[in-house]
Regions:
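Signature of long, low-cysteine stretches enriched in small and polar/charged residues
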Residues: 74, 81-132, 238-298, 313
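Short Lys/Arg-enriched alpha/beta "domain-start" segment
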Residues: 36-70
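Bacterial N-terminal signal peptides that target proteins for export
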Residues: 1-9
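Proline-anchored loop/turn motifs at beta-strand termini and strand-loop-strand connectors
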Residues: 177-193
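A short acidic-to-branched-hydrophobic micro-motif
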Residues: 42-45, 204-233
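C-terminal motif of bacterial Sec signal peptides marking the signal peptidase cleavage site
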Residues: 18-20
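Surface-exposed amphipathic alpha-helical segments
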Residues: 135-159, 187, 299-341
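Bacterial signal peptide processing site
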Residues: 22-25
Length: 341
């Protein structure tokens, strides 16, 4: 009898969980689309706190300089909205930080939620009993807050790329390296060899490029050391990315030393290179970002490099767009996995 009751309880719990899940899916499906421009964050906070220590730490954290751009640009553009003005017009914004400072707060902390008033939306709430606690919470959670906002923007761009994908390009890249990023509509295959592919999107006054290449692992050499990575990149650029005139080709700029970080994203371990590029014997240049990782069998090094040329415009958003393509890389599914799908 006890076993029957226990089984019935489990069934009821499962049914309730399924119903709750379905209700949440229905709720999200009915939400309006987000508003606001990419890289913009609404900060809901009182004017005094915005102009005081809390606003200062938010600006220092979120408006810090975006790394490795030719000119200064902030990580995010912050827009202050007082609590009284936070109406439905602002509630559908893509990125929202609500700073709730009240002596009634008994559990200080930072809460993260998605799709509260619109979709796909990120809402971050800082609850604190006073301004000093709010400042401390923001400092302690700064890296997570930035990561959440960056991932939200990246996920939106990847979702769009998958929805409007140039599948013929992915097929070519798959054949060369066994996987591919997702290229959104408008990108074209510009150059292809056995170990190098150049994909480009070239609207007026802007060029966004993705370079995909591979080279063999040399036994006994640390292929992922900064020195090895930068040397391989320089060689590839000189051999495969010519400029507009004779004896011109892409190089890494000496204006700023490239940075190398080792990261992991969705199970893929890679080295991230950020820096500036220029054209030898010419006056073109811009930012780039690369992800470098091993092939599944460990016999080859694979590189995905996104770069931007936009002399008339700010570069941050253009770079984030090509970076999202690089982040969207997935290994090709085998036949058995395709059958399951």
């Amino acid at each position: 009898m006890k076993r029957i009751i226990r089984n019935l309880a489990l069934v009821c719990a499962a049914v309730l969980a399924l119903a709750s899940c379905n209700q949440e899916k229905t709720r999200k499906a009915l939400l309006p689309n987000i508003t606001g421009t990419a890289g913009e964050v609404i900060v809901v906070i009182g004017q005094n706190d915005w102009e005081g220590a809390v606003g200062t730490v938010l600006r220092d954290s979120l408006s810090r300089e975006f790394p490795q751009l030719p000119q200064r640009e902030p990580m995010f553009n912050l827009v202050n909205v007082p609590q009284a003005a936070f109406t439905s017009m602002f509630q559908v914004h893509r990125n929202i930080i609500v700073v709730n400072i009240s002596k009634d707060v008994t559990e200080p902390g930072v809460l993260y939620r998605n799709d509260v008033w619109a979709a796909p939306q990120t809402v971050i709430r800082v609850n604190a009993p006073d301004s000093e606690t709010a400042v401390q919470l923001i400092k302690e959670n700064c890296t997570i807050i930035i990561g959440m906002l960056e991932e939200a923007e990246r996920a939106r761009m990847i979702r769009n790329a998958k929805k409007y994908e140039e599948r013929n390009i992915a097929t070519a890249v798959n054949e060369m390296v066994g996987g591919s990023p997702h290229f959104p509509s408008g990108y074209k295959l510009k150059k292809r060899t056995d170990d190098f592919i150049w994909v480009s999107y070239d609207p007026e006054y802007v060029s966004q490029g993705i370079l995909i290449y591979k080279y063999p692992v040399v036994e006994g050499e640390d292929m992922m050391s900064p020195e090895s990575l930068l040397a391989a990149n320089s060689k590839m650029l000189m051999e495969n990315v010519p400029g507009m005139f004779e004896n011109t080709y892409m190089i890494m700029s000496s204006y700023a030393q490239p940075t190398v970080k080792y990261m992991k994203y969705h199970g893929l371990q890679f080295a991230e290179i950020r820096g500036l590029w220029e054209v030898h014997n010419d006056y073109m240049g811009g930012p780039f970002v690369s992800h470098v990782f091993y092939s599944p069998d460990g016999q080859e090094v694979i590189v995905l490099q996104g770069f931007v040329y936009a002399p008339k415009y700010d570069k941050r958003q253009y770079l984030r767009q090509v970076e999202s393509i690089v982040y969207s890389f997935e290994w090709a599914k085998n036949e058995k996995e395709n059958e399951k799908d």
